[in-house]
């Protein structure tokens, strides 16, 4: 216990003065007497008194005086500094040369910053693309072609969608016979004139003459637009599956003279029915009017003459058909021979107008 008490010392005689500007400081400093005690080794964590006025003992030996330098000393210092600077510069140049020789074959990595060069007099200018003022003002065709191609693709896709999904309505709206035979000008558009041709045929020679005049008028209309009528009839009446039948065999009438004389009348009626066919109508026509147009059609597939049966098997007789048509005394155009009676036959087989434009084999 006594040893512990000797090691532990309490700060009793030390006074802490926090009033540095108090007037009593100077008086107290004068009265304080310095107690000189033997020096002991300093210990950490304890406060010790220090005398600021105590001067450390100067080491005996060479004394260094830091006074003003004489001019001779200054000149020596300057000469030595210049010599050191020249030596350092020479060493730096040697290091640079050695580094340049070592890194010569290596390619320096370009900096990420973009570098710009003036190419007015450079030979590399010939390799660059030339830009003139005209090309700046007018856009190049290559920049316009992708837009046109994309528009063409869009148009083709729309056309394919329209033809695949809405074929019957588009065929009715866009068929050229609608423009060639308007409903207001053609006399065969009204339902009254539609039902009259069979009555005229029964009236006698005067009715036949009137029918022949109508046939000539229909020829003038159809001959100018035979190609368009053929195209529309080709879309509206696809060929049925089976052996191909020549279309002229339908025109070949029976060998009786009465049928050969009555031939121009059904052709006129068929021309009228073809002019009425492509007109789009959302309201279906009554079924009572349809047999009237089918009466004026030459014999269909069920009642074909033996000549037409032989032609169906693959032995066409265009000479006999043309000869019998000429006996009637009227020249029938090729487009009317090929397509118009088939139009009447399809009308007699398919009565509702919606089924006319449906692609596929007919009944």
UniProtKB/Swiss-Prot annotation:
Where does it live in the cell? Answer: Cytoplasm; Cytoplasm, Cytoskeleton, Spindle; Cytoplasm, Cytoskeleton, Spindle pole
Positions of modified residues (Phosphothreonine): 145
Per the record, where are the segments of Polar residues compositional bias?
186-196
Q: Where are the sequence repeats?
A: 38-41, 68-71, 238-241, 243-246
Which terms under GO biological process does the entry name? cell division; microtubule bundle formation; mitotic metaphase chromosome alignment; negative regulation of cell growth; positive regulation of DNA-templated transcription; positive regulation of microtubule polymerization; regulation of mitotic spindle organization
Q: Low complexity bias: where?
A: 133-148, 197-210
**Which parts of the sequence are annotated with region: 4 X 4 AA repeats of P-X-X-P?**
103-246
Q: Which family does it belong to?
A: Belongs to the PSRC1 family.
Task performed by this protein: Required for normal progression through mitosis. Required for normal congress of chromosomes at the metaphase plate, and for normal rate of chromosomal segregation during anaphase. Plays a role in the regulation of mitotic spindle dynamics. Increases the rate of turnover of microtubules on metaphase spindles, and contributes to the generation of normal tension across sister kinetochores. Recruits KIF2A and ANKRD53 to the mitotic spindle and spindle poles. May participate in p53/TP53-regulated growth suppression.
Q: What is this protein called?
A: Proline/serine-rich coiled-coil protein 1
Q: Which gene encodes it?
A: PSRC1
């Amino acid at each position: 216990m006594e040893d512990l008490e000797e090691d532990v010392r309490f700060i009793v005689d030390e006074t802490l003065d926090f009033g540095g500007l108090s007037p009593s400081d100077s008086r107290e400093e004068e009265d304080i007497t310095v107690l000189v005690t033997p020096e002991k080794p300093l210990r950490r964590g304890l406060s010790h008194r220090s005398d600021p006025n105590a001067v450390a003992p100067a080491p005996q030996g060479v004394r260094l005086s830091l006074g003003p330098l004489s001019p001779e000393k200054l000149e020596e210092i300057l000469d030595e500094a210049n010599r050191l600077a020249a030596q350092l510069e020479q060493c730096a140049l040697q290091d640079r040369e050695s580094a340049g020789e070592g890194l010569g074959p290596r390619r320096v990595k370009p900096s990420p910053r973009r570098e710009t060069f003036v190419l007015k007099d450079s030979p590399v200018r010939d390799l660059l693309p030339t830009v003139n003022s005209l090309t700046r003002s007018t856009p190049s065709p290559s920049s316009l072609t992708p837009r046109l191609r994309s528009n063409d693709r869009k148009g083709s896709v729309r056309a394919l969608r329209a033809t695949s999904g809405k074929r019957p309505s588009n065929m009715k709206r866009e068929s050229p016979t609608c423009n060639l035979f308007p409903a207001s000008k053609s006399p065969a558009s009204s339902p009254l004139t539609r039902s009259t041709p069979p009555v005229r045929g029964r009236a006698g020679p005067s009715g036949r003459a009137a029918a022949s005049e109508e046939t000539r008028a229909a020829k003038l209309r159809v001959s100018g637009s035979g190609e368009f009528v053929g195209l529309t009839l080709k879309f509206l009446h696809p060929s049925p599956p089976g052996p191909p039948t020549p279309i002229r065999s339908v025109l070949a009438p029976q060998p009786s003279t009465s049928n050969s004389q009555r031939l121009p009348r059904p052709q006129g009626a068929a021309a009228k029915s073809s002019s009425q066919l492509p007109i789009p109508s959302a309201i279906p026509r009554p079924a009572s009017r349809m047999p009237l147009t089918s009466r004026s059609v030459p014999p269909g597939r069920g009642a074909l003459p033996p000549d037409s049966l032989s032609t169906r098997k693959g032995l066409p007789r265009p000479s006999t058909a043309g000869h019998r048509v000429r006996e009637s005394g009227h020249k029938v155009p090729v487009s009317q021979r090929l397509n118009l009676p088939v139009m009447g036959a399809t009308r007699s087989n398919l009565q509702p107008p919606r089924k006319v434009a449906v692609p596929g084999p007919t009944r």
